[in-house]
Amino acid sequence: MLDREAEDNNVLYILKPVASSCGRGIKVIGKKTKISRKEGYLASKYVSYPHLINGFKYDLRVYVLVSSYDPLRVYVYNDGLVRFATEQYSLDTNDLKKRFIHLTNFSVNKKSENFKDNKGTGEGEESSSKWSFKALRKAYEENGISYDYVFA
């Protein structure tokens, strides 16, 4: 019971303003943080232990077309973007406000001194802040992760 209570007190939430974009106004907060009720936020439990690549948090931009709802017809493009945070991941409470650790938005991370642009050439992609799914497949396979299983 005490373990569960301690775990509940360590829960983090991510707050996203409902009328914003490009990573503006996003906050990672603890359970006891007070927030203004005047501002509209979408709150979600924060994934505190995400899968990391080389110590960096990342997300996937997947392109999907829904051309019909009845009958349902969905097309998923076979490539997409892997967007990285530009500072190594940390759950240290002193780092919760560091946007370059917790956010993967391109519009946020392009302002980081650690941002690495691959200039769209695909060369040196694995050391850049944005990858193709081809580079992700390579990284997964080098680490014993089945790309096909993940995307099945």
Feature annotation, model-predicted:
Residues 4-152:
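Catalytic core of tubulin tyrosine ligase-like
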